[in-house]
Structures are given as structure tokens and as C-alpha cells.
């Protein structure tokens, strides 16, 4: 089950922890993976680690032309079957102090770029009557978080966008879904002391922070044939932190 042999996948934000884990998991299931992000050296290192069926495809999604160019580059490797919109960043500030450019910068990368990538990917997917679009949102898109009005808006918008797209393309065999991570362990959280980690984990019923592999497993499922009857869904992977 969950094999992806012969499939072509594009993972954005592949140089980060979650993105790299997703790329590794898709590759392990047999997919060819295009690794995109802004850090060329990290992408090339991951491609070298994975070896055959892995390609570094750097792109800066702040550039409005980048999504179309990236999908065209991937299509030259093989027709794109699986798009994983994982790239994103935060620029936190309380709303009263948030500058317009900080609001817009987050929406440009975290919401507008995923839309542009989906639009570019759908051209081929609809012709082939098959495809998977999977976007990585956040628990913050459902619950909100102080100081993250821009990020919360982008991640909530990603869910609404995905539901609309899912309805538009379902008749052509293309599914559109979302994975919403909760609190995931990162190098930043690794630097916390045990007391600080314990406090963070108090709000997680399963008693631990998530790992990038937890998110990657959800993506593999949604990318697989076994998820062919799942579309317009948001899979919350948060240890029970928010039971939505």
C-alpha cells in the first residue's frame, strides 16, 4: 500500500525539516521528487543523499513568475503527478504594529504562491485526468495565534482555496487536500531546556511534540492511490492539541 512508483512529485520548501522529510518519504515510496526551495546547496545535498530519482530545482516563490517556471521545469523531467505546497515563512508582529509589507510578504509566499503552483500544475493534471495537490497549512489557520494575523490568514485561506479547487477538479480525477501540522520539533525547540519543553507539551494530549515524519506520513497517504476518495479534506496532525 501507499506505493508511488512512476509518480512525479514536486515538494516546495524541501530544504527545511518538514519539506525534506516529505521528500524523503515520497522518494522512499518510489516517486521521483523535484526538490524546490531557495537554498540551492541544501537542495543539492538532499538530492545527492536520495540519489536516483531526485532533482534540485531552486526557485524563489516571491517572484510571481517563479511558480509557472518551476512547474515547467519539473514537467521536463516527467509530467507532474503530485504537488506538495510546503514552502512558507512567518513574519510575526502584533496586528497594531504590523506593517503592510509584512502582511503582504507572508500572504505572497504562503497563499498566493501555492495558488499559482496549483493553477500551473492543474493544466497537465486535468488533461491526464489524474493528480494530487497537497498543501501544508497549520493549526494556526484554524485556531489563530497572537502576533500571527498574517500567517493565520494565509493558512486559513489555504484551506478555503483547497476546498474550492477540490470541487472544481474532482470530476477529472484530481484531488486537493490539506495537512495541518501542530507543534513540530525543530532546531529552535531542540535548544529549549527540559522545563520549557514540558510546558509546551502540557497542551498536547499525546504528550510530545510532533516530528517532521509525522507530517510526511500524512502526505504520503494523501498522495497515494489509497486516498483516491479523499478530497477537500484537512488532515489535522497535532497530537490532539486541537481536536477539529
Stretches with model-predicted labels:
Residues 170, 175, 230-232, 238:
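Short, small/polar-rich loop/turn modules that mediate ligand/substrate recognition or access, typified
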Residues 8, 15-16:
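Conserved glycine-rich cofactor-binding loop
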Residues 118, 154, 162:
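Active-site helix of classical SDR
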Residues 59-69, 100, 213-214:
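The beta1-alpha1 cofactor-binding region of Rossmann-like NAD(H)/NADP(H)-dependent oxidoreductases
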Residues 138:
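Residue(s) in the substrate-gating loop at a strand-loop-helix junction
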Residues 123, 167-171, 228:
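Alpha-helical segment proximal to the catalytic Tyr-Lys
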Residues 94-95, 102-107, 189, 200:
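Substrate-binding pocket helix/loop in short-chain dehydrogenase/reductase
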Amino acid at each position: 500500500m501507499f506505493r508511488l512508483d512512476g509518480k512525479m512529485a514536486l515538494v516546495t520548501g524541501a530544504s527545511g525539516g518538514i519539506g525534506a522529510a516529505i521528500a524523503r518519504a515520497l522518494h522512499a515510496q518510489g516517486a521521483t521528487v523535484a526538490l524546490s526551495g531557495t537554498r540551492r546547496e541544501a537542495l543539492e545535498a538532499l538530492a545527492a543523499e536520495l540519489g536516483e530519482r531526485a532533482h534540485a530545482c531552486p526557485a524563489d516563490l516571491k517572484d510571481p513568475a517563479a511558480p509557472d517556471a518551476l512547474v515547467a521545469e519539473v514537467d521536463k523531467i516527467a509530467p507532474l503527478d503530485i504537488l506538495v505546497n510546503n514552502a512558507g515563512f512567518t513574519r510575526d508582529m502584533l496586528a497594531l504594529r504590523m506593517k503592510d509589507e509584512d502582511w503582504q510578504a507572508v500572504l505572497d509566499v504562503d497563499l498566493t504562491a501555492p495558488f499559482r503552483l496549483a493553477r500551473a500544475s492543474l493544466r497537465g493534471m486535468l488533461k491526464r485526468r489524474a493528480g494530487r495537490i497537497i498543501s501544508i497549512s497549520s493549526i494556526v489557520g484554524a485556531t489563530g495565534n497572537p502576533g500571527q494575523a498574517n500567517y493565520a490568514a494565509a493558512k486559513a485561506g489555504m484551506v478555503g482555496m483547497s476546498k474550492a479547487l477540490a470541487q472544481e477538479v474532482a470530476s477529472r480525477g484530481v484531488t486537493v487536500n490539506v495537512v495541518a501540522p501542530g507543534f513540530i520539533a525543530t532546531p529552535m525547540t531542540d535548544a529549549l531546556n527540559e522545563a520549557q519543553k514540558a510546558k509546551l507539551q502540557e497542551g498536547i494530549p499525546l504528550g510530545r511534540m510532533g516530528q517532521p515524519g509525522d507530517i510526511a506520513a500524512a502526505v504520503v497517504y494523501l498522495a497515494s492511490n489509497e486516498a483516491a476518495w479523499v478530497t477537500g479534506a484537512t488532515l489535522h496532525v497535532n497530537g490532539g492539541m486541537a481536536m477539529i
